[in-house]
Amino acid sequence: MTQSFEHLSVLLTETVAGLNIREDGIYIDGTFGRGGHSRKVLEQLGPNGRLIAIDRDPQAILAAEQFKDDSRFQIVHGGFGQLAQYVEELGLKGKIDGVLLDFGVSSPQLDDAERGFSFLRDGPLDMRMDNSQGQTAAQWIARAEIEDMAWVFKTYGEEKNSRHIARCIAADREKTPFLRTKELADLIARITKNKERNKHPATRVFQAIRIYINSELEQIDQALEGALTVLAPEGRLSVISFHSLEDRMVKRFIRRHSQGESVPHGLPITEAEINKSRKLKGIGKAIKPSAEEIERNARARSSVLRIGERLPYDLESV
């Protein structure tokens, strides 16, 4: 029997409102998950609207069956980093009215011990978003050099004790390979001296391994750049981040494309020419969940929503 896990979409109302839904518009939900954001978009679309959802998790593809009778909806099995490719294959490049991206790990993924994402539930050390392909976390840990592990923990988890943890993992795996989440989490908890308040010592390392195994930051970079190529003029980009690495990427991306290309001082160039290189404008300030939402869903606590709007200046080259 398949166990079901509840998932509450974070910043649901704010994120969909940021898309400025048109009844006959075409929208992308690049991170379908369990369909919370997609459902909200479909509620606001008219009969001629269209929603294309994307997810690389086979369980998410199964969850999309809930919309199988809605002709406005279709699901693509793949990574959100390839959204521009999928849109181009559909002949919709430059015609998308909104792109929604939610970079969080869904509650069903965290709560299902068999997926191997959680340090609070014992399960196989997997962590793959698409568990039908690619190396598992256990396979990577078994082969990775100490220097490589330390780099991953520091770069993707901002873990201060990265080298110490990497050395301890390498020493322990010589005796017994790490195959279960609890084995790795218990080791990290045991060797960590300066513990952060209200945070499990393994939090940063598990985050780092997950990001590395799934090439998450590369996927984010590709998705953001891809959104620029598929959005129609005045099309919206709504992006939810869950940790500082992701949010910095989104913030810098919107800022860079809002300012246009940098021009050497003294170069004779008009403001109109500079504006031609601007591709986005930021919409409002970063949005964080309300106290009420955090009380309902503690996993929303670290989420940040940023919204951008596609400018038309260079669309003649799209």
Curated annotation (Swiss-Prot):
Family note: Belongs to the methyltransferase superfamily. RsmH family.
Catalytic activity, as annotated: cytidine(1402) in 16S rRNA + S-adenosyl-L-methionine = N(4)-methylcytidine(1402) in 16S rRNA + S-adenosyl-L-homocysteine + H(+)
Enzyme class, spelled out: transferase
Residues binding S-adenosyl-L-methionine: G35, G36, H37, D55, F80, D102, Q109
S-adenosyl-L-methionine found in the keyword field: yes
Protein name: Ribosomal RNA small subunit methyltransferase H
Gene3D superfamilies: Putative methyltransferase TM0872, insert domain, Vaccinia Virus protein VP39
Disulfide bonds: none
Keywords from the named record: Cytoplasm, Methyltransferase, rRNA processing, S-adenosyl-L-methionine, Transferase
A GO biological-process term: rRNA base methylation
Superkingdom, taxonomy of origin: Bacteria
Record keyword Cytoplasm present: yes
EC number(s) given by UniProt: 2.1.1.199
UniProt subcellular location: Cytoplasm
GO molecular function: rRNA (cytosine-N4-)-methyltransferase activity
Higher taxonomy: Bacteria, Pseudomonadati, Pseudomonadota, Gammaproteobacteria, Alteromonadales
Broad class of the protein's primary localization: cytoplasm
Function as written in the Swiss-Prot or TrEMBL entry: Specifically methylates the N4 position of cytidine in position 1402 (C1402) of 16S rRNA.
GO cellular component: cytoplasm
